[in-house]
Amino acid sequence: MKLLLIHADYMEYEVKKKTKLAEPFDGKGERVEEVLVAFTSVEKGDDENVVRKAAEAIREVAEKVNAERIMIYPYAHLSSNLADAETAVKLLKQLEAELSDFEVHRSPFGWYKAFRISCKGHPLSELSREIGGEAEAEVTQALKDEEEKVVSYWYILTPEKELVEVEKFDFTGYEKLRKFVNYEIAKRRAVDVTPPHVEYMRRLELADYEPASDSGHIRYYPKGRLVKTLLEQFITRKCIDYGAMEVETPIMYDRNHPTLRRYLERFPARQYIIKGDKREFFLRFAACFGQFLMLSSSTITYRNLPLKIYELTRYSFRKEQRGELVGLRRLRAFTMPDMHTVAKDMEQAKEEFFNQYRLSVEVLREIGLEPEDYEVAVRITKDFYEENREFVHSLVDILKKPILIEMWDHRFFYFVLKFEFNFVDALDKASALSTVQIDVENAERYGITFVDSDGKEKHPYILHCSVSGAVERVMYALLEKAKFMLDEGRLPMLPVWLSPTQVRVIPVSERFVDAAIKIADDIARNGIRVDVDDRNETLGKKIRDAQTEWIPYIAVVGEKEIESGKLAVTVRAESTQKEQKRVEMSAEELAERVRSECEGKPFMPLPLPKLLSLRPSFR
């Protein structure tokens, strides 16, 4: 089904003459004011599923443009693959019924009509949508069918290395683990309530939905871009320090490439499809494709192993189901740190798996997510577990907390072992962050080989590793963690190294603005992001605004501070909702404190004008 959506001051049409395909109609036409007009072509293969998705697409646009009236206008000129008249009329009536929560008008099918329309001309006033049914439905069903063939057995591996059936485990004291287990077993991914981080990302002017793009695509304001860039730089550096070689690969690939086609047939997924001049391409949903093709044309010997390559994909694309998309948690375009390790044998693969597990713990901890902030899941085939029981049990020693084990009766996926660190948010939804998999299939599929010490070519094992998970999801986890801080009576905040403004200097009056600017400049020379609230507002409002922005350090400057050389500094991390922690310190002491908290982290300068009076508002 093809849709052309026009937000109009008015739409009027007049019925002239019927065709042999016309549905019964005894009116002359109508005029509708303040209306979203949906010019609609019903295509071959469209069904009730397509109608529901079309209604959802129309509803989404109507809500964005605040339209209360919708006109469905049959328009054959949007497609060359039209459904028959009987089907078209039936589905158009169903579309009308699906949108019954609006005031709906439907122009008759099969009549020659004259029409006039006045398009409003704003950025969302002219949009098109192409609604597919069969392909996505087939992919979704294929995924479900394959998943249903694999039988899962659920256990908890205790710190004492006892494997306990989930039903028999005592979750007392492990409430987050209980929520995670329930979420995993229920497999209910749809979002019914907006999670707290969505309000935070908007209020802090970090990010927001882009209404002119597809669902699940985000725009980042200067503050959000800074946070995201710092995370990208930090994660990339950790992978390179670990020994990975950074590469870059294309974002789209030929759907009919022999190797890639076999992979997509084996593991169907929801992809964006791009039509080229002569070929169809799919947008990557991971860096695997490009990195594996690169490795397949490389000369590798046992001396090179373990070999690690890394790419930060900006972006990877996956057409997640619309009902699962929300904020930064689940997107259709996302930034994924993707490292692949080539290992000569299973022993080397297990060693790397263990090391990358520890690396992932370290990366999340340095970002600002402690082990108590997430739950661990290990997914494994029964055969691999039986053969490597001691190794699997050793994983619990790293964090010394119970972990969820999903054990499959046989292998369907390309891996035999996988771990995930999952963040459970305020709505009890779980999202995977760090993950590592041992892949036993793709080296052969892609023709990746290495020359062993005996001179023979062999297929290696491959580890897939994302030490943090998608960067957007890390931001989501940090913001959701802030909500938990609020629930505990603390003040929500980002880690100091990620805070867009680390220190705000507030003059008590206009007379002290110049002094505040000088102090801010002195602090900023130490590689610290400092701004000055020079607005003509009361001191109380300036302090409240700084608190609303989660500024880690708020320094007030007045006569007393200038004379003493000591600033009155509010320390957010040590404050509570009931009491503000205020200390006196010099500008040098403040700079040293901030610098020590950010040691070893990347730095970027302030992304906005230093003076608040010069800043635009992105809300």
Swiss-Prot record:
Its main location: cytoplasm. The keyword ATP-binding applies. Residues 1-133 are annotated as: Editing domain. Its cofactor is Zn(2+). It is found in: Cytoplasm. Belongs to the class-II aminoacyl-tRNA synthetase family. Coiled coil: none annotated. Its EC number is 6.1.1.3. Binds 1 zinc ion per subunit. Zn(2+) binds at C288, H340, H464. Not inhibited by 1 uM borrelidin (BN); probably does not bind BN. Residues 196-495 are annotated as: Catalytic. GO terms for molecular function: ATP binding; threonine-tRNA ligase activity; tRNA binding; zinc ion binding. It is an enzyme of class 6 (ligase). Homodimer. It catalyses: tRNA(Thr) + L-threonine + ATP = L-threonyl-tRNA(Thr) + AMP + diphosphate + H(+). Keywords: Aminoacyl-tRNA synthetase, ATP-binding, Cytoplasm, Ligase, Metal-binding, Nucleotide-binding, Protein biosynthesis, RNA-binding, tRNA-binding, Zinc. It comes from Archaeoglobus fulgidus (strain ATCC 49558 / DSM 4304 / JCM 9628 / NBRC 100126 / VC-16). One of its GO terms (cellular component) is cytoplasm. GO terms for biological process: threonyl-tRNA aminoacylation. This is Threonine--tRNA ligase.
